[in-house]
Amino acid sequence: MEIVNFGIIGCGRIAGRHAIQIEKFGKLKAVCDIIPEKAKAMGLQYHCNWYTTVEELLQKEAGNIDVMAICSPNGLHKTHTIEALKAGCHVLCEKPLAISVNDCGEMIKQAENSNKRLFAIKQNRFNPPVAAVKKAIDEGRLGKIYSIQLSCFWNRNDDYYHNSWKGTADLDGGTLYTQFSHFIDLLYWMIGDIRNVACFTGNYAHQGIIDFEDTGVVILEFYNSAIGTINYTVNSYQSNMEGSLTIFGEKGTVKIGGQYLNELEYQKIQDYVIENLPEGNKANNYGSYVGSMSNHDKVYENLVDVLTKGVSINTNAFEALKTVEIIDKIYREAKKIK
């Protein structure tokens, strides 16, 4: 496989990030969206075939696509992933992998049955300060981890949800799935799996606009005995304020901050200094709102290397499943309090 051929299902905003990287690392053969104008526009822009149904895409492009990028609404990830896997494609699925634990399991099982790879997007892992702190933890520089604080203070105004699948229970799933699943992933990746949660959530500024919470406070207990809290909201006035992770350890304290975990704001580590961090990529800017750091280049570079050189996968589906399990655990606890 010299040139990796790609397809994209879903031509919304995030699909553009994928298309840019596909042009760098492979070839975009076809795109699909139920809104003809979106599919046609992307098809013309990237000189590829365009379709308005997944069925037609998979039928007419049979054998032409090596990897299908799933950029459709969260609640459709399972269906589109399984259809692409059954058609003989490897799959790269946008976050979250799905919005139920059972759906994730079915997707992983189908990938195994089809003997195909299922890649997940975990872009915040590639933020330079995040990668540096993860390395320090793995090397034991912070010693035993005592506690953590994850702060997610973003803004999503009414326009963000207007005439969109975003904000709906069936297709969006919740604020932790769409806005902050990358942040939850880092807790699992850097600190460990979570044993117990307690939480309070509420919809304070988006009543009648979204089907779920816009704010939450979560208390965590990890299996390794560390404890922590998550304080999240999309009600930061007018703009994103902060996306930060503070870690308190036996031998050090660090805070990764900025608006989207893009700055090493504080460090005090025994006999160790994190320095000379490379400049990270800019955040995904969608005009009316800003997302996480745009690290899709690193995701695609690894994906192509996995398929062409046999290197290890950086973001596998099992770890994406863990993120969904943690969010599911939080939401289940929140429902008990309602």
Stretches with model-predicted labels:
Residues M1, E56, V67-I70, Y223, ...:
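C-terminal helix-rich "cap/oligomerization" subdomain common to oxidoreductases
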Residues M1-Y46, G63, K336:
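N-terminal Rossmann-like dinucleotide-binding module
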Residues H18, Y46-Q110:
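Beta-loop-alpha module in the N-terminal Rossmann-like domain of NAD(P)-dependent dehydrogenases
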Residues T52, C93, L118-A120, I230, ...:
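Hydrophobic residues in well-ordered beta-strands that form the structural core
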Residues T178, I184-E263, D297-G310:
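Contiguous beta-strand/loop segments that form the cofactor/metal-binding neighborhood of enzyme cores
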